[in-house]
Swiss-Prot record:
Its EC number is 3.4.24.-. This is Penicillin-insensitive murein endopeptidase. It is an enzyme of class 3 (hydrolase). InterPro entries: Hedgehog_sig/DD-Pept_Zn-bd_sf, Peptidase_M74. It comes from the Bacteria. GO terms for biological process: peptidoglycan metabolic process; proteolysis. Binds 2 Zn(2+) ions per subunit. Zn(2+) ion 1 is bound in the active site. Zn(2+) ion 2 is bound at the dimer interface by residues from both subunits.
């Protein structure tokens, strides 16, 4: 499938969630042992943790949206990564969307983030902590040139390279989505230590943040993992294909309704949403 078709499918998957979803009516995590259920783009979570809003190592953006819930493994990853970044004197980690209290489909902006295993992290590390006003209305820093072919040299910093690398080297991380131009710059900067690049995947948009995805927890028996990324650093022909013009004759795919929920997620909705 060419990149234009993939982009249209991704847009449809995201826009399908623009209507209000019943998951928004669940305002607190569902009690129980932590269980991620279903797939990243069609699932839910029982026993989600709340990411502590106050931390010396990170700051949480858009708290009014209440998207700071996730599997305990995700909360621990954020705390682990931000502590590493702080210990290296790199700055404060800016945390974007995680998931809703019970996971599930958003009403816009994300097709995934449904099982408590995804988090968006800004690709900037301020030395001075942001104010409450800045956190509620964050200003993203677009690192990619207008033509989409490379990063903006004056904005690309070694600390951002290190942030992505630290995240990719974490044992629980299975994928990190960034803009193709950012992946390209990582390939140029990586040197001989390249194993971690396999986890960094080019994807549409993602010009100012990275989308980190964790593997399914071993005890979440109904969680559906993705296949591992292809072998290698992903810096060759696959990456270059993202910079090629779309093939002529690409047709817009038909709009699809969301797939049925996993039975456990449907049962959760039936019990907790009137």
């Amino acid at each position: 499938m060419n990149k234009t078709a993939i982009a249209l499918l991704a847009l449809l998957a995201s826009s399908a969630s623009l209507a209000a979803t019943p998951w928004q009516k669940i305002t607190q995590p569902v009690p129980g042992s932590a269980q991620s259920i279903g797939s990243f783009s069609n699932g839910c979570i029982v026993g989600a943790d709340t990411l502590p809003i106050q931390s010396e190592h990170y700051q949480v953006m858009r708290t009014d949206q209440r998207r700071y819930f996730g599997h305990p493994d995700l909360v621990m990853f954020i705390q682990r990564l931000s502590s590493q970044v702080s210990n290296l004197g790199m700055g404060t980690v800016l945390i974007g969307d995680m998931g809703m209290p019970a996971g599930g489909r958003f009403n816009g902006g994300h097709a995934s983030h449904q099982t408590g295993l995804d988090v968006d992290i800004f690709l900037q590390l301020p030395k001075k902590r942001w104010t409450s006003a800045q956190l509620l209305r964050p200003q993203a820093l677009d690192l990619v040139s207008r033509d989409g072919k490379h990063v903006v040299p004056t904005l690309w910093k070694p600390e951002i390279f290190s942030l992505i690398k630290l995240a990719a080297q974490d044992k629980d991380v299975t994928r990190i989505f960034v803009n193709p131009a950012i992946k390209q710059q990582l390939c140029l900067d990586a040197g001989t230590d390249r194993d971690w690049l396999r986890k960094v995947r080019p994807w549409f948009q993602h010009r100012a943040h990275m989308h980190v995805r964790l593997r399914c927890p071993a005890d979440s028996l109904e969680c559906e993992d993705q296949p591992l990324p292809p072998p290698g650093d992903g810096c060759g022909a696959e990456l270059q294909s993202w910079f090629e013009p779309p093939k002529p004759g690409t047709t817009k795919p038909e709009k699809k309704t969301p797939p049925p929920l996993p039975p456990s997620c449907q049962a959760l909705l039936d019990e907790h949403v009137i």
